[in-house]
């Protein structure tokens, strides 16, 4: 039996969830040697951003273990509100921004048993647009600091890869300050220059 109803008011078996549940968005593709990395945003996991890797043998899988707080890593940053590069990889070293606690973590693909190593403090500080300098043992990042009064302070910083700044924020070195907007620090191929 058919029913007549005004346009847009009839019951439909198609819901927004039906359309979006299986949606996967891909972004932030990077290559490190024979490995290719990318971020998948998965609607089926409440929009969680997952870091995946295709290794040189063609095997594809999630890369990161649980955080020290036993959380699934959500590879995302809110720097400038819309984000920025939420991870970087160089020579098998990954630095990732976890949306769950706002911290940066280091992960060494070759030494998986070490797990995720916190690199930054908890608090009202965001990091994004990450660039690893393995030669100097640093990760460069745009830092958005919300700890003070008024507007957030945006700086370009260098963070030690050894995890020491997770306990002592004074070890994070400010490279550029005094601007309203800093974005995309990029290391030259020879490692001698940093552009932003």
What are these regions (language model features)?
Residues 2-30:
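Non-catalytic, glycine-rich low-complexity segments
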Residues 12-20, 61-77, 114-121, 171-176:
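A short beta-strand motif characteristic of beta-propeller blades
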Residues 21-35, 73-94, 124-139, 177-195:
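Conserved beta-propeller blade repeats
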Residues 40-50, 72-81, 96-104, 120-127, ...:
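A flexible loop/linker signature enriched in serine peptidases of the S9 family
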């Amino acid at each position: 039996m058919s029913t007549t109803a005004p346009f847009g008011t009839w019951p439909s078996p198609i819901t927004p969830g039906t359309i979006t549940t299986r949606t996967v968005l891909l972004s932030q593709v990077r290559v490190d040697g024979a490995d290719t990395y990318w971020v998948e945003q998965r609607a089926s996991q409440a929009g969680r951003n997952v870091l995946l890797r295709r290794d040189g043998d063609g095997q594809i899988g999630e890369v990161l273990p649980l955080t020290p707080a036993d959380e699934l890593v959500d590879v995302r940053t809110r720097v400038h509100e819309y984000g920025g590069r939420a991870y970087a990889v160089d020579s098998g070293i990954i630095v990732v921004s976890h949306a769950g606690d706002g911290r940066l973590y280091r992960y060494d693909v070759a030494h998986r048993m070490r797990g995720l190593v916190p690199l930054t403090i908890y608090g009202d500080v965001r990091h994004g647009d990450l660039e690893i300098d393995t030669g100097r043992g640093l990760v460069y990042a745009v830092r958005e600091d919300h700890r003070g009064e008024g507007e957030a302070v945006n700086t370009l910083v260098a963070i030690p890869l050894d995890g020491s700044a997770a306990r002592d924020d004074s070890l994070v070195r400010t490279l550029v300050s005094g601007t309203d907007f800093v974005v995309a620090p990029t290391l030259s191929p020879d490692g001698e220059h940093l552009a932003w």
